[in-house]
């Protein structure tokens, strides 16, 4: 039996940034280039409401573009960048140039060996194994 990944943090007061069927970039070297969000782990919403996800949330993605070995497969991923501005507790507003995810294994370790581009500090605090591969934490 596989261990359950503990998802930490509160979702209260978050802006709906990425939802079902959002197309995102893959920010690691696992073989995928573009992915589509098809599920949000830990989302407890209202019937028929479209689930949404934000920075540092774990989502289920389907790889749409990439190497033939990973295309048309489903993976778990963590959102590390989002275009929609969000507010930090100190009052600053942060937004990135693109929406990006890092593909992870079922045990929570990154599938790739490097992360391209910056990642958000919220994702680095919640997922330290991803932060160890990142070149820049904003």
Curated annotation (Swiss-Prot):
One of its GO terms (cellular component) is cytosolic large ribosomal subunit. The keyword Disulfide bond does not apply. The keyword Lipid biosynthesis does not apply. CDD domains: Ribosomal_uL14 (cd00337). Pfam families: Ribosomal_L14. It is found in: Cytoplasm. GO terms for molecular function: large ribosomal subunit rRNA binding; structural constituent of ribosome. GO terms for biological process: translation. This is Large ribosomal subunit protein uL14. It comes from Saccharolobus solfataricus (strain ATCC 35092 / DSM 1617 / JCM 11322 / P2) (Sulfolobus solfataricus). The lineage of its organism: Archaea, Thermoproteota, Thermoprotei, Sulfolobales, Sulfolobaceae. The gene is rpl14.
